[in-house]
Regions:
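A structural boundary/capping signal
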Residues: 2, 59-216
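Short, glycine-biased loop/turn motifs at secondary-structure junctions and
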Residues: 2-64, 69, 138, 210
């Protein structure tokens, strides 16, 4: 169990790393918790809102791909009971995460057998749009190491985030990225390929240090 200091640090960094939104006529940085909040607020500004929201789009999965996933993958099953027939050790909260992601966007969530950050993702997670992410190209399929390297070089203005990202093929996958902290807004820093949407939590400085030690 986390102590109160770490819990407050995670809450503070979560709020600080939110998105620029306009709600009730006021512009501020706030976490996008879910689709309901996303729908009722303006993203960035009134002039940018429609374009920003229209970027949350993806190619529907083909029937053949769905059938392969259904036959081979616990995470594609419709219920916890069905998933546990294929993977009895599954943490049932993974399906809570799956529902949270698919309620917002996408067709499927490629879940791991074990998600070591599940508690923090569920407790402190938020959504970010990916269409205007800064690109700092790293090694392919090495998002954790890439993010660790960039953070090591930019600790004063960046924060590592980890969780899941939605690709244009409609699949959410495990992913890590960074937030570039700016005076008036925050921007995703993507080190591999473009993503439609992100969901995860921002790490505290101590967590970033540990993440970098383990991944870079």
């Amino acid at each position: 169990m986390q102590n109160e200091k770490i819990t407050q640090e995670l809450i503070d960094i979560r709020n600080a790393c939110g998105s620029r939104v306009v709600l009730d006529g006021k512009s501020h940085i706030a976490p996008i918790d879910d689709k309901a909040f996303f729908d009722k607020c303006l993203i960035y500004s009134e002039s940018k809102n429609l374009h920003a929201k229209n970027t949350v789009a993806w190619r529907p999965m083909s029937d053949d791909w769905k059938e392969r996933c259904r036959s081979n993958s616990f995470w594609f099953q419709n219920t916890v009971a069905e998933a546990k027939k294929m993977f009895p050790e599954m943490d049932e909260r993974l399906f809570e995460l799956k529902a949270r992601l698919l309620d917002f966007a996408g067709d499927a969530v490629c879940l791991p057998g074990y998600e070591e950050d599940l508690d923090d993702i569920l407790e402190y997670g938020q959504f970010w749009l990916g269409y205007n992410a800064e690109r700092m190209r790293g090694e392919a399929c090495q998002c954790h190491a890439n993010s660790a390297r960039i953070w090591e070089q930019n600790q004063d203005k960046s924060v590592i985030c980890t969780g899941y990202a939605l690709s244009a093929d409609g699949m959410w996958r495990q992913h890590s990225w960074l937030i570039h902290r700016k005076p008036r807004s925050n921007k995703i820093v993507e080190t591999t390929r473009p993503r439609v949407l992100y969901y995860g939590f921002a790490l505290t400085p101590e967590m970033c240090e540990r993440f970098a030690d383990e991944n870079f």
